[in-house]
């Protein structure tokens, strides 16, 4: 004989729903914490990749012909437009200048992402310069920079960094 007034499971259904909801909430919280902890590493990897590409491009430029600064009629030197899309955690990306120390080697790219600082050697015999003599310092955001290889009458090599035209 079948019972139609069986309500034994009626009390366990809400308890099961609450327990499942709590477990799902805990899993979502753990995933959110994992993503928050992974964000600095992802941002650093992005800047690592972009700075490495820029250093490789600069080394390539240094293997080509420079523009001679002492000859107004000289043809343009080897030139490259570089695009940077720096993530939110980027404190700086600098060419030939270390903002933390106020100096640094002029042939290096310095960058700092969420407190993690790195430096890449481009060339020990070359220097980064800007046409107006200021320091090129980028923060988070999107940038297009023009880098041109030039040399002076004494044979000193420079990579001129300016905003792309």
Label the predicted regions.
Residues 85-165:
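Intrinsically disordered, low-complexity regions enriched in Pro/Ser/Thr/Gly and acidic residues
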Residues 17-21, 48, 75-76, 123-125:
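Generic detector of short, locally flexible boundary/turn motifs and exposed helical patches
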Residues 50-66:
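N-terminal alpha-helical signal peptides/signal-anchor transmembrane segments
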Residues 61-89:
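Short, glycine/small-hydrophobic-rich surface segments
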Residues 53-57, 82, 130-134:
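N-terminal start-of-chain detector that recognizes signal peptides
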Residues 2-38:
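N-terminal single-pass transmembrane signal-anchor helix
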Residues 40-51:
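Membrane-proximal amphipathic alpha-helices
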């Amino acid at each position: 004989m079948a019972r139609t007034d069986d309500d034994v499971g009626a009390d366990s259904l809400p308890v099961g729903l609450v327990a499942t909801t709590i477990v799902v909430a805990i899993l979502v919280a753990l995933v959110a914490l994992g993503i928050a902890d992974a964000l600095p590493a992802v941002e650093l990897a992005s800047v690592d990749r972009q700075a490495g590409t820029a250093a490789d491009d600069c080394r390539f430029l240094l293997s080509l012909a420079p523009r001679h600064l002492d000859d107004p009629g000289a043809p343009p030197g080897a030139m490259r437009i570089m695009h940077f899309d720096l993530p939110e955690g980027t404190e700086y990306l600098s060419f030939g200048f270390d903002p933390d120390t106020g100096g640094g080697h002029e042939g290096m790219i310095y960058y700092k992402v969420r407190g993690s600082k790195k430096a890449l050697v481009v060339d020990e015999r070359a220097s980064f310069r800007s046409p107006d003599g200021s320091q090129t310092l980028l923060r988070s955001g999107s940038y297009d920079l023009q880098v041109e290889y030039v040399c002076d009458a004494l044979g000193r090599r420079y990579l001129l960094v300016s905003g792309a035209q």
